[in-house]
Amino acid sequence: MSVSETIVLVGWGAIGKRVADLLAERKSSVRIGAVAVRDRSASRDRLPAGAVLIENPAELAASGASLVVEAAGRPSVLPWGEAALSTGMDFAVSSTSAFVDDALFQRLKDAAAASGAKLIIPPGALGGIDALSAASRLSIESVEHRIIKPAKAWAGTQAAQLVPLDEISEATVFFTDTARKAADAFPQNANVAVITSLAGIGLDRTRVTLVADPAARLNTHEIIAEGDFGRMHLRFENGPLATNPKSSEMTALNLVRAIENRVATTVI
C-alpha cells in the first residue's frame, strides 16, 4: 500500500483509537506518523504501526504531517491547533466546545489565515451540516438542536446535579439554553451543538435542549431550522462508542471520512 498523506493524531482515547482502527481496517493510504499524548513515558496499547509518541506541540514541525487531527479534549485545541496551523499544517478539531471561547477561535483562524493552512471542523456526530451551512447563505430565522442520550451517558456531568439520573423513569429535559452555554457546561456531550451553530446562526442564537432518557439506547440529535430557504428537520440516532457512551460512533466515522477525502480522487 502506498502512502499518500501523513497525519498526526492528538489524543489516544476512545475516538483517537477508533479512528486509527477504522483507517487500518479500511487499508487507507493515510499514514498516522505520530500520536500526541500528555506523557509519552506511559505505556500505550495498540499504537498504529510506525507511529511515534510526541507530547509537545513544537514536535509537530518535524513530523512530516500535512494534517493534525485533534481528539484529546478541549484543553488541547489551542496549543496543538496554533502549532499546527502556524507551521502550515491543516488542523481538524473534534473538541469543538473550545470554540465557545471567541478569542481562542479567532487566534486559530488568524493562524490559519497567516500560513494558508485550513482550520477544519468536521460534522462530529451529525450529518446534514452541509445543508444547514448552505441555507445560511440566506437568512435563517431559528435553529433548535435537541440532544437525547441515555441517562448513563450524562453521568459524571453537571446533569447529575440537575436531575436524579438513577431515579428518572422517563425522558427528562434538564437544560434549555444557548448552544454556547450548552457546549461550555457539557463539553463532551454537547460540543456538537457548536458545529450546528457555526454552520447556521451562531452560538448565541442557536437553542439547545438536553434530555436524559433512561429508555434510550442510542444518542439522538434533532435539528430544526427555519428561514428563507424553507424548513429543515434532521434527526440522527447514533450508536455510542463502545468505549465511551458520551460519544457517538458517527463522530469517529466523520473524522475518517474527512481524512480519507483528502486523498480521494472523487469526494462526496
From Swiss-Prot:
EC number: 1.4.1.21
Keywords: NAD, NADP, Oxidoreductase, Pyridine nucleotide biosynthesis
Residues that coordinate or bind NAD(+): A125, N191
Protein's pathway: Cofactor biosynthesis; NAD(+) biosynthesis; iminoaspartate from L-aspartate (dehydrogenase route): step 1/1
InterPro entries the UniProt entry points to: Asp/hSer_DH_NAD-bd, Asp_DH, Asp_DH_prok, L-Asp_DH, NAD(P)-bd_dom_sf
GO MF annotations in UniProt: aspartate dehydrogenase activity; NAD binding; NADP binding; oxidoreductase activity, acting on the CH-NH2 group of donors, NAD or NADP as acceptor
Active-site residues per Swiss-Prot or TrEMBL entry: H221
Reactions accelerated catalytically: L-aspartate + NADP(+) + H2O = oxaloacetate + NH4(+) + NADPH + H(+); L-aspartate + NAD(+) + H2O = oxaloacetate + NH4(+) + NADH + H(+)
NCBIfam families: PRK13303.1-3
Role, per record: Specifically catalyzes the NAD or NADP-dependent dehydrogenation of L-aspartate to iminoaspartate.
Misc remark: The iminoaspartate product is unstable in aqueous solution and can decompose to oxaloacetate and ammonia.
Family: Belongs to the L-aspartate dehydrogenase family.
Protein name in the entry: L-aspartate dehydrogenase
Biological source species: Brucella anthropi (strain ATCC 49188 / DSM 6882 / CCUG 24695 / JCM 21032 / LMG 3331 / NBRC 15819 / NCTC 12168 / Alc 37)
